[in-house]
Amino acid sequence: LKRLYELRDYARHNIDTVVSVGIGGSYLGSKVIFDVQCGAFWNNLSTEERNGYPRMYFAGFNVDGDYLAGLIRTLEYQAQKKGPDYKVMLVITSKSGSTIEPMANFMILEKALQDRNINYEVVAVTDVSDDEHPTILRAMALENNWKTYSIPYGVGGRFSVFTEVGFVTAALVGFDIEGFLAGAASM
């Protein structure tokens, strides 16, 4: 949990907007945590009203070009409004490290941020693999020195919310991870 709390504290002071990119269990669990913790209008609240936590959007759960274009316009607007200090965190989650929808959405988002000179950093959440035979996503993370979190071997998508797949989102919006785990353990 220490690394997750460090991520939480870092994001509260350095990140304006998080875009969580995933599909299936890599999306749904995080989206439920966000909805439970934040509600529908979180992104409309001021930084103070969000207790310093960043805005959060989701992408990669489909191949809808209009949705992605709208998200990019939103990020561009926010960057123009805040100025050069605006910073985005892309959280790309893929168990296999190569799922088409999130990887394609991630590449489009990254290119859009680069083209618009918007500051960003990347966090990768992917299957545990050794550095000798990494998933495509883990190889990208190693090459680019991104923060990484792991999906344990054998954990299916619907249960991944109880791993760093869900916990990264939870940390980034101030969700009580320890309480969540205690509740799950009591069932």
For the regions a protein language model found, what residue spans apply to each?
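Extended, charged alpha/beta regions that create polyanion-binding interfaces
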Residues: L1-D9
